[in-house]
UniProtKB/Swiss-Prot annotation:
One of its GO terms (cellular component) is endoplasmic reticulum membrane. Pfam families: Peptidase_S10 (PF00450). Glycans are attached at N76, N414, N417. The keyword Protease applies. The keyword DNA-binding does not apply. This is Serine carboxypeptidase-like. Coiled coil: none annotated. The gene is CBP31. Disulfide bonds join C58-C298, C226-C241, C264-C269. Keywords: Carboxypeptidase, Disulfide bond, Glycoprotein, Hydrolase, Protease, Signal.
Amino acid sequence: MATGKSGGSSAEDLGHHAGYYRLPNTHDARLFYFFFESRGSKGEDDPVVIWLTGGPGCSSELALFYENGPFHIADNMSLVWNDFGWDQESNLIYVDQPTGTGFSYSSNPRDTRHDEAGVSNDLYAFLQAFFTEHPNFAKNDFYITGESYAGHYIPAFASRVYKGNKNSEGIHINLKGFAIGNGLTDPAIQYKAYTDYSLDMGLITKSQFNRINKIVPTCELAIKLCGTSGTISCLGAYVVCNLIFSSIETIIGKKNYYDIRKPCVGSLCYDLSNMEKFLQLKSVRESLGVGDIQFVSCSPTVYQAMLLDWMRNLEVGIPELLENDIKVLIYAGEYDLICNWLGNSRWVNSMEWSGKEAFVSSSEEPFTVDGKEAGILKSYGPLSFLKVHDAGHMVPMDQPKVALEMLMRWTSGNLSNASSSFQRLDFTM
């Protein structure tokens, strides 16, 4: 894919790849991906980072072109280098998943996924195919990253990789950590935080807060039922709990619930028309090899298929990974309502693991970039929580330099002054 590059370098020269892997153990599922080799000084030795966009059903091309990819799309449909693309510090993969998202497809509806077991098995199969084609990258440190509904995908995917390594199922994947940005991971805790966050930020009044909070106990009970009995109760939980969010949404009107400082424009609250136009161009489609597959930024079909998964708690698999020195970074832009920092901070602090007390009692420290405070960081051992200033739901879009700096320090074990000194005592991070 070499559209709009100066000097006419080919995509291969730049180390840019795009294509499909057909997944074994499916009827006909094909996952579409982009792979950008690192522009950094260590090049091929930089970590391999995979990015998953949420939705469920939203294409990772959203992140590629608007957040942390190598380039942005200009109004004249040319590509402009992104100085803060994560390929500056990593070998970067974007994948359209679950099947049916973005350019990924299957000719067989039985390949539609409804839960994290199906999603994580497909992602594991994708990685095996990727490292079979790129064996020189298999030895590198490997990190899973993403945002929003990827707060569900990522813990399940990380556990699947960990299990695959443990059981010697295929190529060993050198999993070192995962990062979730403004994710939905523990709905019982996070849905309860909606009213608190909205009141704190002046989005609702105290009487509105009291009224909406009456729904919370029913929501909590419904989530509990979903966790024990599954299926239909999970749909019930989705309906009941989203009354909390929709009540707030009605009150805030045209405000963007991904960034409460901004108005909501268009169906996804942002103008994504450049990407949609660019991906319809015949020349682009030919170079990507996607034929006439219809591209939608976010697939309603995939979203509907995952409804029963929505209210499940994905925090449960994380403690085992922490105990095995897998680094976990939860970060959140402070102006996002839908997956707000408050709810994320609460589930991180209430998670049961051997370092819980030490994490909870560890002091917050400023996260500084260019001598300015860019966020507030709390760390202990392999676990870190970072609240990012002046950012909404999409931190790499709102604070690109801070996000790149975060990735670089985290993957090299220097996110926190405290954690790097701690690391020598106990954990190999």
